[in-house]
């Protein structure tokens, strides 16, 4: 029997999944629909999702996260920090059952919701209660291929939480908004000091969802591949000059269907 996530008889509001959901989730669309139902009922009742977000759960939350699956290597180990109601980790697990996903979340009411839904839906996801920067969490969940996060902190802070959980050459993927270029300009030196490099700003879900998901990507460089801090500083590039720190130069790379 499926557990009662909300502890009440509340029924989810009617909302048929958009056509894009069938493209993203395929034969696992029913599982995605169950996740929508859980967010719209228990998620609201427990304060994990604001009531005003319910009408846009599919587009702004579930699909917004799921399309990031196109960046994931096959059978990758993925750690989702500050997972909250399971975004983006649960949509990724539904869209890509080959991924080995761990959700890291410090609050008990959230981890309880996550564990109950995961058990009810039969998903192969690990839930770790704790803060991403704590040594116990790093010991349990570290060495990941990918660490994801969504709208939880500025890039510099996300890097402090995410990079210690990665293997060398693993990728930090932060789901961000339109201000990511400004954040990168402000925080790039801090990211480099922490060992990050190969910065990119990507768009996922192009041609699938109405508003593509903006993702900041950085790679954890092994110590021997990191730029020396003692090298002579290069002159700052003038505004509008090509290139730039990490090769981003304020440009966004759009990923179409042919790239997946």
UniProtKB/Swiss-Prot annotation:
<dbReference type="InterPro" id="IPR003682">
    <property type="entry name" value="rRNA_ssu_MeTfrase_G"/>
</dbReference>
<comment type="similarity">
    <text>Belongs to the methyltransferase superfamily. RNA methyltransferase RsmG family.</text>
</comment>
<feature type="binding site">
    <location>
        <begin position="132"/>
        <end position="133"/>
    </location>
    <ligand>
        <name>S-adenosyl-L-methionine</name>
    </ligand>
</feature>
<keyword id="KW-0808">Transferase</keyword>
<keyword id="KW-0698">rRNA processing</keyword>
<dbReference type="GO" id="GO:0070043">
    <property type="term" value="F:rRNA (guanine-N7-)-methyltransferase activity"/>
</dbReference>
<keyword id="KW-0949">S-adenosyl-L-methionine</keyword>
<comment type="function">
    <text>Specifically methylates the N7 position of guanine in position 518 of 16S rRNA.</text>
</comment>
<feature type="region of interest" description="Disordered">
    <location>
        <begin position="221"/>
        <end position="260"/>
    </location>
</feature>
<dbReference type="GO" id="GO:0005829">
    <property type="term" value="C:cytosol"/>
</dbReference>
<feature type="compositionally biased region" description="Basic residues">
    <location>
        <begin position="251"/>
        <end position="260"/>
    </location>
</feature>
<feature type="compositionally biased region" description="Basic residues">
    <location>
        <begin position="228"/>
        <end position="237"/>
    </location>
</feature>
<feature type="binding site">
    <location>
        <position position="150"/>
    </location>
    <ligand>
        <name>S-adenosyl-L-methionine</name>
    </ligand>
</feature>
<protein>
    <recommendedName>
        <fullName>Ribosomal RNA small subunit methyltransferase G</fullName>
        <ecNumber>2.1.1.-</ecNumber>
    </recommendedName>
</protein>
<keyword id="KW-0963">Cytoplasm</keyword>
<keyword id="KW-0489">Methyltransferase</keyword>
<feature type="binding site">
    <location>
        <position position="87"/>
    </location>
    <ligand>
        <name>S-adenosyl-L-methionine</name>
    </ligand>
</feature>
<feature type="binding site">
    <location>
        <position position="82"/>
    </location>
    <ligand>
        <name>S-adenosyl-L-methionine</name>
    </ligand>
</feature>
<dbReference type="InterPro" id="IPR029063">
    <property type="entry name" value="SAM-dependent_MTases_sf"/>
</dbReference>
<dbReference type="Pfam" id="PF02527">
    <property type="entry name" value="GidB"/>
</dbReference>
């Amino acid at each position: 029997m499926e557990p009662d996530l909300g502890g009440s008889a509340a029924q989810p509001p009617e909302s048929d999944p958009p056509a894009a959901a069938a493209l993203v989730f395929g034969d696992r669309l029913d599982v995605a629909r169950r996740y929508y139902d859980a967010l719209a009922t228990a998620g609201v009742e427990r304060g994990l999702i604001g009531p005003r977000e319910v009408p846009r759960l599919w587009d702004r939350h579930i699909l917004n996260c799921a399309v990031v699956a196109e960046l994931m290597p096959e059978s990758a180990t993925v750690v989702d920090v500050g997972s909250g109601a399971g975004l983006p980790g649960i949509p990724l697990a539904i869209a890509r059952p080959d991924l080995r996903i761990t959700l890291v979340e410090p609050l008990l009411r959230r981890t309880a919701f996550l564990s109950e839904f995961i058990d009810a839906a039969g998903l192969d996801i690990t839930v770790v209660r704790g803060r991403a920067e704590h040594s116990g969490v790093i010991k349990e969940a570290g060495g990941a291929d990918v660490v994801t996060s969504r709208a939880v902190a500025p890039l510099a802070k996300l890097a402090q939480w995410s990079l210690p959980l990665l293997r060398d050459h693993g990728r930090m993927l932060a789901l961000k908004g339109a201000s990511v270029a400004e954040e990168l300009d402000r925080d790039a030196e801090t990211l480099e000091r922490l060992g990050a490099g190969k910065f990119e700003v990507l768009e996922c879900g192009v041609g699938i969802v109405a508003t593509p998901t903006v993702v900041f990507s950085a790679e954890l460089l092994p110590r021997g591949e990191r730029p020396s801090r003692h090298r002579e500083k290069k002159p700052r590039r003038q505004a509008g000059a090509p290139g730039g720190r990490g090769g981003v130069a304020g440009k966004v790379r759009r990923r179409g269907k042919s790239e997946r």
